[in-house]
């Protein structure tokens, strides 16, 4: 299945985070890029960022991972309805970054 840039996708049931191994079923975001190796680069939506929480974002920062985005196989995601706006994503991400700075992370 091909996805378009900006299209909303959801992670399929049973998919785990490739770095930490926990379940990310249902996480949603927007397609930023699709490459020729059948992987899709996703920027998480604001609801997923809120669900992820500050603790995981901090853990990602400590491991030098970008917590706002993830690359998954095309077979691991499916089309979904858009749940927010890009402004919502920017607002939540900025809030989380500010909290990390406050905490000295």
Where are these predicted regions, by residue range?
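Basic/aromatic-rich interaction segments and small domains that mediate binding to polyanionic partners
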Residues: 3-76, 80-90, 102-105
């Amino acid at each position: 299945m091909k996805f378009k840039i900006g299209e909303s996708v959801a992670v399929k049931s049973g998919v785990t985070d490739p770095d930490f191994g926990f379940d990310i079923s249902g996480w949603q975001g927007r397609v930023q890029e699709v490459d020729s190796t059948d992987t899709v680069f996703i920027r998480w939506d604001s609801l997923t960022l809120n669900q992820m929480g500050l603790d995981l974002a901090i853990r990602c920062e400590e491991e030098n991972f970008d917590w706002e985005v993830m690359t998954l196989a095309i077979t691991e995601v499916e089309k979904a309805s858009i749940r927010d706006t890009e402004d919502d994503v920017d607002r939540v991400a900025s809030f989380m970054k500010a909290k990390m700075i406050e905490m000295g992370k």
